[in-house]
Amino acid sequence: VDTEVGLKDHKIHDIGALRDDGATFHQASQTAQNQFLQEGKVDYICGHNLIHHDAHYLHLNGILIDTLYLSPLLFPKRPYHHLVKDDKLMSEQMNNPVNDCEKAKELLMDEIAAWNLLSENKRKIFTLLLQHEEEFRGFLMYVGTIETDETTTDVSELILSEYKNHICAHADIPALAAQSPCGLAYALALIGTDDYQSVTPGWVLHNYPEVEHFIYVLC
């Protein structure tokens, strides 16, 4: 799902939606959009910056997946992902929400593939850190990795094992996880790359300024 919202009037000017059966929607009517999603028996709703932008304007009935927050976690290494620049989707067509839906779907498929390429330990670490964060929970539910019986102590042991030669063995990981699980996840994603020129995107540092400090503490 994608919306075009006026910068001055903050009103919805256009809505685009793409279902997994290939059907598309392109109108400015929320009522018609909801009917379109209901007809497709949609359980999960995906978008780029969906949770803190589109979802504020749309009355969405489903589990939300936001490709924006997943991208720096799963593509932390330069040149990052070709569909993303800063916090925006790269699109051939300006102000076309259906085209943006197609790009978000392509990005989601790549994010799922990248997730599946992570080691089992990394998937478990990110799940334990992020499963209660609204920006990540929908994706983790979709890929079926929600944990129910793990603790912060367990995730600390997993982190020390997975990043054994990359982080300080005496770092207070439980404290970092308690302070900002998202910040810790982004810091670990960057530490796990072998490209020291890779940097955390500016929008991540704006929303999670603790990431740089966490990297300093861990390394």
Show which residues each predicted segment covers.
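Short intrinsically disordered, low-complexity coil segments enriched in acidic
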Residues: V1-D2, S71-L74, C219
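Entry/capping segment at the start of metal-dependent catalytic domains
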Residues: V1-G16
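Conserved DEDDh/DEDDy metal-dependent 3′-5′ exonuclease domain
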Residues: D9, A17-W115
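Weak global preference for isoleucine
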Residues: I12-I15, I45, I51, I63-I65, ...
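Generic structural motif recognizing short loop/turn segments at the entrances and edges of beta-strands
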Residues: H13, G22, S180-L184
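Exposed alpha-helical structural elements
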Residues: A32, H82, K124-I125, Y186, ...
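Acidic, Mg2+-coordinating catalytic module of metal-dependent nucleases/exonucleases
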Residues: L83-S156
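N-terminal helicase ATP-binding lobe
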Residues: E134-C219
